[in-house]
Amino acid sequence: MTDFNSESRSSFFSNSSALVYLVILLFFTSSFAGVSAAPIEKEGNSTPYVILDEQPIGTSSQYSINGSGLNSENPDWGAANTQMSRQSPRYPSPDGNNLTFWDRTDVPNPREVSNAVCHESIEHPDSRNLSDYVWLWGQFATHEMDHTTTQDGRTHDQLQPDTAHIPVHENDTWMGFPGGLYMRFFRSVIVNGSDNPDPLIQREHPNTITSWLDGSVVYGSDDARGDWLREYNGGRMKISDYPEGDLLPQANYANDPTTPGMSFAGFNFTDSFVAGDGRANEHVALLAMHILFVREHNRLADEIAERNPGWSDEEIFQYARHINIGLIQTITYYEFLPSLGIDLEPYLEYNSSINPTISNEFSVVAFRMGHSQIGSAMLRMDGDRNPIEQGHLTLREGFFDVTPITEEGGIGPILRGLAYNIEPENDIYYSDDLRNQMFGPPGSGGLDLCAIDIQRGRDHGIPDFNTVRESYGLERYSNWSDITSDIEVQEKLNSTYPDIDSVDALIGMFAEDHVENSALGETMHHIIKDQFTRLRDGDRLHFESDNSEIYELRSEIENTTLADIILRNTEIEHIQCDVFYAEQELDQMDCTHLNKEISNNIEPNSSDISMIFVLTLFFVLTLVLVVMLKVTKTENNINLEEEE
């Protein structure tokens, strides 16, 4: 016979109460945790960002489409179609004529320099294990910040465009033809009036897109393009629906004359996609990145619309756009630049005295660093990191061809391959696909990117390497060994240029020994660091600035990686957490998609509180009822035993 005394009964109630409190505690902690560490099924994940009590972004807190107005005292700083800045003095023309300053007679022509210095027989993988995402993000960021169009008759009023075609001798090993030929080169468009032959008037160039990291590569830099890209329904951007997933909107020039212009070379323009930047179709890897961030915008827009059913299309669009811009900024500053070995000073606050305008030295020289980091192979891999059925691509097979995305598996295989492959070392050498066969075979439109990069620097009046260094406060070099410890490169420079003060700035920067723990030489490192510091500190709406209406989200945005965006917008299930470093072991690709909850630290609205209260009360009452029933049943059993 059981002796169920008052002490035992008290203990029972005590334990039951503890159980109730424990369950309630677990309920609250699971409901309001900031970040869940447990991976979830991607198909079941519809809300990676949960932003409570959102408010629409006011007009004054939005990035304007053309980049103007961020600085109230200097509203044109960073705006599209404004003059690029210049840190170093212009290269002096021998005859004093500004129209021919590019025609240097004291050094070989750019193709000769390319053949003598930039030819590479064997690719050397990056010594710091950087992946192909480094050069790709560099290209994506370049198209986000600067675009100087050329006088090719399509983008300039001149019927007779200003040219500086590059001679190719008939004995050229790769491009030679009997009688020789010229590689086409159109000079950059100039700011109105700067083509005056008066030597006192300098020839300057406009940046036709915004300087800011403001998502212009996704949203455009002018009203016509920006409006065309929008769906004007639920804050979304236009897409094309393919079996491979949502892709960019298709160009349809025949039926829609308002379709924004895109760059075409060697393929039917009706096959192209339309993006915020006109160069999106240049390569399938670049196109994949464009698609990724349009998907991210629409994902954000859908979730913002679901949480805020009363918001207008414009309010949803601008909020999603602002977060997407913040993601581009954080990937650039907290993943891309550190992968190059560039560590900026900690962000303090917006500084209205800083001019962020893109400089000539950055645009046409230093930030072309990625051109030597592009290899000849374009890997495409399945979920097990094996080649897909259609196989890998060569780099040149990816130029202006969208079929690898539209017909051969979408962007997933490309994004996996980029994370797997180690990019070439940043050095003086260019891949053969870029140096002899860019956009086509030799004699059939094929170009030499190294020669074009050199000629573009001369076209923009960039002075010699030592003068550029001096302009940025760096010491001039006296000997070839000061530039590089590589004896072979020293000999190439010595045999190509008459003296150390004649070296093209681009070649000098590529030849430099790297800064310790960096992928860059000193000059390139210094110029890139300077430009990105000015872009950040001179941006009133930078996501870390307290002027930004997403300021309260800064820590969550800062902790978002490119891997996160890939995982939540593609079929990819596993990838390394830092995709800027290559990983070739499948078991190390352990960055799975987490259910990240972003809160701006504002209290939930009244409807949220009411719902939480009702659910909690129901939960507690249910538990109390269960406990009471258990106690009653136990007491009945005791009474029966006592009667026996």
Annotate each language-model stretch with its function.
Residues 38-299, 303, 322, 326-451, ...:
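N-terminal accessory/cap region of cofactor-dependent oxidoreductases and related radical enzymes
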Residues 312:
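Acidic, glycine-enriched active-site microenvironments
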